[in-house]
């Protein structure tokens, strides 16, 4: 098993991943912290064991990259043959997901439009959006100016009517 040196944290499964796995597997069971730590250590040791065996199989077949087949052979040689069917299912699911991702990323490439043309179209759309934004700002400014003018006219009108009322009162006082 791995020693408890400072570099071991880099060689273990993240604790959050183990906690999630435990919750999904045993949703109604409380698991003590030391039991969680034991699960982390067991998982880490299992991965080291399988990867070491897969590496040996890879080296024997004079390959430089460990393939899924090497991992499957390692499971078999270490006595974990009962896991192989499930491992193959998960491998197929992973390949399907990877293929979907590649297809999604290549959609842009398959449009048949060169990247320069796409960038030009994007710049046109940005320019159009800036123009629309400027027009909206101009309209808002004009509306504010009109509102200010109307407020000034209303204030001037009120002031004029107040002055006219004052003049009338003075004339009435003169008549007395």
Swiss-Prot record:
Sites of N-acetylalanine modification: 2
Highest taxon of the lineage: Eukaryota
Keyword hit for NADP: no
Compositional bias ranges of the Low complexity kind: 152-167
Residue segments, region Disordered: 152-176
Annotated positions of the Phosphoserine modification: 105-106, 166-167
Subcellular location: Nucleus
Pfam families reported for this sequence: CBFD_NFYB_HMF (PF00808)
Stretches assigned to the Histone-fold domain: 12-75
PTM (free text): Phosphorylation regulates its interaction with TBP. Not phosphorylated when bound to DRAP1.
The entry's keywords: Acetylation, DNA-binding, Nucleus, Phosphoprotein, Repressor, Transcription, Transcription regulation
A Gene Ontology molecular function term of the record: TBP-class protein binding
Residue window of motif Nuclear localization signal: 100-103
One Gene Ontology CC term in the entry: mitotic spindle
Function: The association of the DR1/DRAP1 heterodimer with TBP results in a functional repression of both activated and basal transcription of class II genes. This interaction precludes the formation of a transcription-competent complex by inhibiting the association of TFIIA and/or TFIIB with TBP. Can bind to DNA on its own. Component of the ATAC complex, a complex with histone acetyltransferase activity on histones H3 and H4.
Self-association and partners: Heterodimer with DRAP1. DR1 exists in solution as a homotetramer that dissociates during interaction with TBP and then, after complexing with TBP, reassociates at a slow rate, to reconstitute the tetramer. Interacts with NFIL3. Component of the ADA2A-containing complex (ATAC), composed of KAT14, KAT2A, TADA2L, TADA3L, ZZ3, MBIP, WDR5, YEATS2, CCDC101 and DR1.
Protein name: Protein Dr1
